[in-house]
């Protein structure tokens, strides 16, 4: 009886550790590899507070800093650019009724107003100083016409 019980406990521990390893190491590594960020010192892909997965900073960023190319010279959204979640500008009210203001105001990044004159690429820019681990968000409402616009009723949950 003790052998069966110890086998069940060992199996439970093995399965639990396997789930933890898969969820917190293997899946994030695969997702970051897919988007070219596996060993990036700048960004990582992770579970979003807004929706699905998002892109997060790995180091502090300065307001106005170019973060990465979001749209290439052929007007195709880059894989990394596709991971920025939409948050409407102005005041955003969460389900709890909290209004975002000041440093917590989203969006915290934006698409450059024009393509780079030399490369034809569109960059994501920091709208304010960003801390380590912040999810990047942008307002898609005023992006160029070749980028799909968001549902006007969408509200960014904080």
Per-range role (PLM):
Residues 1, 5, 14, 99-102, ...:
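A detector of low-complexity, intrinsically disordered, Ser/Thr/Gly/Pro/Ala-rich segments
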Residues 2-4, 144-158:
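C-terminal helix/juxtamembrane-tail motif
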Residues 2-30:
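Terminal signal-anchor or tail-anchor transmembrane helices
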Residues 36-48, 72-146:
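Catalytic core of the SET domain in histone-lysine N-methyltransferases
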Residues 50, 54-56, 60, 129-131:
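Residue-level "contact hotspot" at macromolecular interaction interfaces
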Residues 56, 66, 121-123:
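Intrinsic-disorder/low-complexity, polar/charged segments enriched in Ser/Thr/Lys/Arg/Asp/Glu/Gln
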């Amino acid at each position: 009886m003790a052998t069966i019980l110890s086998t069940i406990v060992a199996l439970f521990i093995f399965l639990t550790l396997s789930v933890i390893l898969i969820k917190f190491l293997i899946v994030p590594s695969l997702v970051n590899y897919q988007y070219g960020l596996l060993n990036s010192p700048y960004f990582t892909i992770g579970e979003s507070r807004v929706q699905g997965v998002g892109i997060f900073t790995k180091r502090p960023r300065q307001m106005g800093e170019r973060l990465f190319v979001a749209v290439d010279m052929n007007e195709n959204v880059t894989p990394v650019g596709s991971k920025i979640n939409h948050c409407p500008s102005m005041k955003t009210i969460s389900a709890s009724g909290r209004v975002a203001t000041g440093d917590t105001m989203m969006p915290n990044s934006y698409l450059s107003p024009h393509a780079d004159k030399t490369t034809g690429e569109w960059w994501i820019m920091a709208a304010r100083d960003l801390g380590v681990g912040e999810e990047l968000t942008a307002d898609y409402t005023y992006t160029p016409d070749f980028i799909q616009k968001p549902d006007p009723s969408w509200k960014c949950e904080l």
